[in-house]
Amino acid sequence: MINTTFYARRLHSLVGLLALGGFLMEHILTNASALGGAEALNGKLAMMELIPKPIFLGLEIGAVAIPFLFHAIYGIYICMQAKNNPTKYGYLNNWNFAFQRWTAWFLLVFLVWHVGYLRCYVKGVLGTPITYELIQSYVTSSPIVFVLYLIGMLAAIFHFTNGIATFLMTWGVVKGPRAQKVAGLLSMMLCAALSLVTIAFMVSYFVPMH
């Protein structure tokens, strides 16, 4: 008998790492161009617009939307089964396990809002191109929007980087307590680095650094 749960969990982690992790990294690196000002970010966004619309839409659906739906739906199933007891046990791994689930729930709501507004409504319905000026106006329009956007980005970064360590353990790449501890430490270092970059480009919309 085929163990469907075994393969589903591995596919879930693989999709999260490659498809969604790749999209997050592209998102962060592109937005980091804002540190160089409007011209730098608009130049990056203009390069993406050079991709033919049918191909770009196909990539959005096939490489992002469908993997996200699978990761989200199966992730909800995992969350519903998970039992988090960070305060009872107090171990770092258990806290990471809990935060992985908590950020998953938050990200589900955040991405519906963020993608629904910017990609589907502003760009899709209104036909307004995404530019530095638009993003700046968006994130500085209200302290609530800024805080929610920043928390959403940081939650996505933690979910991704902690997911890397989980992926390495799930797939048997790192074995033993020492190797797993090193993997966890490296993933948190990456989390800190990406978080600092994100905070920097978010703040730059208020105080240009170029």
What kind of feature is each model-predicted range?
Residues 1-210:
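Membrane-embedded alpha-helical bundles that constitute the cytochrome b-like, heme-associated redox core
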